[in-house]
Curated annotation (Swiss-Prot):
Gene expressing this chain: murB
Designated name of the protein: UDP-N-acetylenolpyruvoylglucosamine reductase
Active site: R176, S226 (proton donor), E296
One Pfam family from the record: MurB_C
Organism: Exiguobacterium sibiricum (strain DSM 17290 / CCUG 55495 / CIP 109462 / JCM 13490 / 255-15)
Alphabetical GO biological process terms: cell division; cell wall organization; peptidoglycan biosynthetic process; regulation of cell shape
Reaction catalysed by this enzyme: UDP-N-acetyl-alpha-D-muramate + NADP(+) = UDP-N-acetyl-3-O-(1-carboxyvinyl)-alpha-D-glucosamine + NADPH + H(+)
Keywords: Cell cycle, Cell division, Cell shape, Cell wall biogenesis/degradation, Cytoplasm, FAD, Flavoprotein, NADP, Oxidoreductase, Peptidoglycan synthesis
Length: 304
């Protein structure tokens, strides 16, 4: 429970209207589910962000970062402490062959701005629904490309609010992983090194990838995207389909009938429904094929 004294202290460094109390997280996730955040902060500047990070550290408050909630399931019990939203930190700029994007910017928008400047390297991201921050954390990728291929560096805060610049090597980018899985950095922006390209060829590739996404993915329902990582030598969606799980349902959550790698919220699903279906899929695939599917989606928060 947040005390009046804690709130008063927060208001010294962040606008009062940017502090939401007991905010429903279902309003901030692609799956449209999740419990309440004790405090939901929406800073508009790096200064406000650094203040909030330092405040959480100095007052021993749990701190959770949130982009646009596209690859996330928040449990029905919600999140204690502070949830720090980057929804207002969305600036994107271009300097020569480099594109600089704030953490809350949509990576789809970054790919479009790169195209506008005839810069190649971010075409793969034209259908990824996440933010720059989320894309860096998980080394997001699609259709043969990934963040690792073009990310130059990142500007971050430590939990004490100190500003650092992290090089490509220090980011430790691997398949759906990075240094952020073990180091508690708060990402402010990413800097991408791109190359000059033919606008017609860039557009052709982006149009092709967008068409593939729209025809193969269940975009008509809320979801967190691809639920599982690709097991070596296999495709998660194919294993799920071959296990007879396409259309399987728990509560309002269903294994998509359009693409078995997705679990969709077809009717007022709770996070408990969604997570239970993830577990059911894992158990069934392991029993049938001896392969344990590892979730790509991040599951956070407390049980109801």
């Amino acid at each position: 429970m947040m005390t009046e004294q804690l709130l008063a202290g927060l208001y010294e460094g962040i606008a009062k209207e940017a502090v939401l109390i007991n905010e429903p997280l279902k309003n901030h996730t692609y799956t449209k589910m999740g419990g309440l955040a004790d405090l939901f902060l929406i800073p508009s500047t790096y200064e406000e962000t650094a203040f909030a990070v330092r405040y959480a550290y100095e007052h021993d408050l749990p701190l959770t970062m949130l982009g646009n909630g596209s690859n996330l399931v928040v449990r029905d019990g919600g999140i204690r402490g502070i949830v720090l939203s980057f929804e207002k930190l969305t600036d994107i700029s271009v300097e020569g062959h480099e594109l600089i994007a704030q953490s809350g910017a949509a990576i789809i928008q970054a790919s479009r701005i790169a195209y506008d400047h005839a810069l190649s390297g971010l075409e793969f991201a034209c259908g990824i629904p996440g933010t720059i921050g989320g894309a860096l954390i998980m080394n997001a990728g699609a259709y043969g490309g990934e963040v690792k291929d073009c990310l130059h560096s990142a500007t971050v805060l430590t939990r004490k609010g100190e500003l650092l610049n992290i090089s490509h090597e220090e980011l430790e980018l691997g398949y759906r992983t990075s240094c952020f899985s073990k180091k508690e950095y708060i990402i402010l922006e990413g800097r991408f090194s791109l190359t000059e390209g033919d606008p017609a060829l860039i557009k052709e590739m982006m149009d092709d990838l967008t068409h593939k996404r729209e025809t193969k993915q269940p975009l008509e329902y809320p979801s967190c995207g691809s639920v599982f990582k690709r097991p070596e030598g296999y495709f998660a969606g194919k294993l799920i389909q071959d296990s007879g799980l396409q259309g399987a349902r728990i509560g309002g959550a269903e294994v998509s009938q359009k693409h078995a790698g997705f679990i969709v919220n077809i009717k007022d699903a709770t996070a408990t429904d969604y997570i239970s279906l993830i577990r059911h899929v894992q158990e069934t695939v392991q029993e049938k094929f001896g392969i344990l599917l590892e979730p790509e989606v991040k599951i956070i928060g407390e049980e109801a």
